[in-house]
């Protein structure tokens, strides 16, 4: 059992196996295998690599641990069509890199370029999925916690956020298609909802359950760990706040896939705070239980896609 725990937590092979299972699950469950769907899958795998880089650079749990990427790819393999059909892989890639850029601005005096880049990526996301604009206050709070947000970086962020809109409107104006802006604005109101998906949508609830099972013990581990430095503590508080923002936003938006995919990306970083600690028997048992739950959800989703449980 200890060897299995160590393999899942520290071995790069575990992350590679999870990535391979994610690809196999995508081939089994996604009916229409288009080029765009393969691109979203590739972006999802790249986001898993970025999690390893973030964990090592900021030492959130253990710099040698590949557990965040493994947990994320395991969650992505449960229902990959959620990413392929709704383009959530692109949102994951854009959001992960924008957060990575902001986290690197810790106590930087001249971070205008980083803020412009990060908020340009978020602006592209908001252009494609307007409900993601709910995360903008959290990003500004992230800059405040990193002690790099001031007047110049704020206006750099504002310019970066509006830049994609100006580019798109300029292209539409030059091609005499500016009239499609009004229907786009009317579609934004249709994305506002006050209800979650029905229980029959396993693709959403399976991912939600997996995210919740990772986040809750991670928060407990963070509360019990009193030896964190100021930067690590600030990052963990921001990550917990981000997951909370995404969970609340799901109640008021129909863009479930984009919001849940971003929450699923952050959850392993929080969960690694508990799972990467050694000498904790409860943690080891919970990780085994989590592995069994993942195996059950994976078999259920693949079996449903193949028609075994219909």
Label the model's feature ranges.
Residues 1-19, 61, 281-285:
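N-terminal membrane topogenic signal
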Residues 22-28, 182-205, 215-220:
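Juxtamembrane membrane-water interface segments that cap and precede transmembrane helices
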Residues 42-58:
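Transmembrane-helix motifs of polytopic, lipid-linked glycan transferases
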Residues 65-80, 92-97, 118:
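Membrane-embedded helix bundles of polyisoprenyl
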Residues 98-113:
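Membrane-interface transmembrane helices that cradle and orient dolichyl/undecaprenyl
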Residues 114-128, 246-250:
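Membrane-interface alpha helices of multi-pass inner-membrane proteins
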Residues 135-159:
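Perimembrane helix-loop-helix junctions
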Residues 219-278:
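Membrane-water interface signatures at transmembrane helix termini and the short loops
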């Amino acid at each position: 059992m200890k060897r299995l725990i160590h393999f899942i937590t520290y071995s790069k092979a575990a992350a590679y196996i999870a990535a391979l299972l994610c690809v196999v699950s995508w081939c089994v469950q996604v009916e229409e295998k288009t080029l765009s769907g393969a691109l979203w899958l590739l972006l999802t795998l790249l986001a898993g690599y970025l999690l390893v880089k973030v964990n090592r650079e900021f030492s959130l749990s253990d710099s040698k641990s590949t557990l965040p990427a493994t947990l994320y790819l395991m969650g992505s393999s449960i229902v990959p069509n959620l990413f392929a059909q709704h383009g959530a892989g692109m949102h994951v890639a854009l959001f992960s890199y924008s957060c990575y850029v902001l986290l690197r601005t810790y106590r930087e005096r001249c971070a205008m370029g980083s803020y412009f880049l990060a908020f340009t990526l978020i602006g592209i996301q908001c252009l494609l999925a307007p409900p993601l604009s709910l995360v903008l206050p959290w990003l500004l709070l992230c800059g405040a916690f990193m002690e790099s947000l001031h007047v110049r970086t704020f206006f750099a962020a504002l310019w970066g956020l509006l830049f994609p809109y100006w580019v798109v409107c300029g292209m539409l104006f030059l091609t005499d298609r500016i009239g499609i802006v009004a229907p786009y604005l009317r579609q934004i109101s249709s994305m506002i909802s006050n209800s979650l998906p029905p229980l029959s949508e396993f693709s959403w609830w399976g991912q939600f359950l997996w995210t919740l099972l990772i986040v809750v013990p991670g928060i407990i581990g963070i509360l019990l760990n009193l030896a964190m430095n100021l930067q690590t503590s600030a990052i963990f508080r921001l990550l917990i706040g981000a997951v909370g923002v995404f969970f609340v936003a799901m109640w008021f938006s129909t863009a479930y896939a984009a919001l849940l995919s971003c929450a699923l990306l952050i959850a392993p970083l929080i969960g690694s705070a508990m799972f990467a600690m050694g000498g904790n028997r409860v943690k080891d048992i919970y990780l085994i239980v989590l592995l069994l739950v993942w195996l059950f959800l994976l078999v259920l989703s693949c079996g449903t896609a193949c028609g075994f449980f219909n």
